[in-house]
Amino acid sequence: VQLLQLYLFVTNPKRYNIVEKKNYSYDEAYGESLKYFQGDELAARVWVNKYAVKDSFGNIYEKSPEDMHWRIANEVARIEAKYPNPLSSEELFGLLDHFKYIVPQGSPMTGIGNNYQVASLSNCFVIGVDGEADSYGAIFKIDEEQVQLMKRRGGVGHDLSHIRPKGSPVKNSALTSTGLVPFMERYSNSTREVAQDGRRGALMLSVSIKHPDSEAFIDAKMTEGKVTGANVSVKLTDDFMQAAIEGKPYTQQYPIDATEPAFQKDIDASALWKKIVHNAWKSAEPGVLFRSEEH
């Protein structure tokens, strides 16, 4: 890395700013950051604890956000140089300096140009599998992908509407499906097991209101100690909300998008909506997602 930096500097010294690589004590980094943030102790501590580049032994290699912004600017300039009319590291630094014009997300601030850790360059990921997803193989594949992303600092979200409802026939010794709630617990436990610099990962689970197990999903976190490693949200549709307003029944089915579903049942939409509101008041979950507003 140092040889590459030297080569880039010698061949084009105006385009790259080489930050000296040395490590700092926590007090040194905190002191410099405190000056940078003009006495804001919280900002200084958060930056040193979460965003200053460190190796796996805890050695700190940046003393203030100025070093971080040069690291990001140099790395982006390296990529820019491959394209016409590239921006120099000085120009990029001017956009980043003191968080004036560009404020990267947390993971990019930590990961871009970081040669000490394998870190994600995105804060959040939505994952799933292509094709048939209702099998143990598919469920565990999602679990593995979730863990791999989380250990690289990524937050993860995935939908459980592909899992067959409780009581559905299965071709194994269990004879019937356990439904989606036990898998909520599995994904939650995986989240709790993955450390991210002393904190657990971030997981969001969702399910369609059209899924026959959506009420069990909505109730899952009402029991203390259950699904503590995940936030949960239910995906609502306009036809469900209209049924709830008019006091009409609403049809749930599995698969949720099938024209000829294997299973259907009618529910009281108004009662389920009231349960969503009550549970959110009681435990702050579930959240609600309106599919027509997703982007």
Sequence positions of predicted segments:
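Extended catalytic cores of very large enzyme megasubunits
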Residues: L3-E294
